[in-house]
Regions:
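Glycine-rich Rossmann-fold phosphate-binding loop(s) that bind the pyrophosphate
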Residues: 26-27, 49
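N-terminal Rossmann-fold NAD(P) dinucleotide-binding loop
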Residues: 30
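Glycine-rich FAD pyrophosphate-binding loop
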Residues: 38-59
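Extreme N-terminal leader/targeting segments of oxidoreductases
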Residues: 1-21, 36-40
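Dinucleotide-binding Rossmann-like beta1-alpha1 core, especially the glycine-rich loop
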Residues: 62-147
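Conserved hydrophobic packing residues within short motifs/helices of P-loop NTPase cores
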Residues: 22-24, 45
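Helix-loop-beta segment of a Rossmann-like dinucleotide-binding subdomain
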Residues: 125-135, 145-178
Length: 178
């Protein structure tokens, strides 16, 4: 009963105010949009049917990535924007977002050839020219196996190693943005 009264009081307060921006959904994206609007001087209302970061954000991969897979579809603008946002999060939330190294094994006869993987890695590095993270590395089969001894050696040509970001607690990052 008390919660219903509090909700009623809250709704009455909201109805008496004017907002420049109403964001529906208090996950990581909604909170980020609300933060951006508030930083631009807008009067922002952030709404959600549940708790902050209780939906998709809570069950995400926790990756703060630049969209490497979008290079395959020539979405260069999207990749560049994602890389800028990754860099921004690494800078403003180092207590929550940290570098994470990835390895892409390359096998003979795979859909993506070693040359295509290398081209993608170079493009990813060039689109993130202002990054604080290390550039990619192309590894030999021996170097790859030393890093990941569990990989199948059959047809292993090597690997591409690159760094993206990972958020430890996406819910906390969301709350800090809200």
């Amino acid at each position: 009963m008390a919660a219903e009264l509090a909700r009623g009081d809250l709704m009455a307060t909201i109805e008496r105010q004017r907002f420049d921006l109403i964001v529906i959904g208090a996950g990581i994206n909604g909170a980020g949009i609300a933060r951006d609007g508030a930083m631009r001087g807008l009067r922002v209302l952030l709404l959600d049917k549940d708790d902050i970061a209780a939906g998709t954000t809570a069950f995400s991969t926790r990756l703060i990535h630049g969209g490497l897979r979008y290079l395959e579809y020539a979405e260069f603008g999207l990749v560049r924007e994602s890389l800028r946002e990754r860099e921004r999060l690494l800078r403003i939330a180092p207590h929550l977002v940290s570098p994470h190294r990835f390895l892409i094994p390359i096998y003979a006869g795979a859909r993506r050839s070693p040359a295509l993987i290398r081209l993608g890695m170079v493009a990813y590095d060039l689109l993130s020219f202002d990054k604080s993270l290390p550039w990619h590395q192309m590894l030999s089969p021996e170097e790859t196996h030393a890093l990941e001894p569990g990989l199948d050696d059959g047809g292993l040509c090597g690997a591409a190693a690159y760094t993206d970001g990972q958020v430890t607690f996406p819910e906390r990052l969301t709350v800090e943005n809200a």
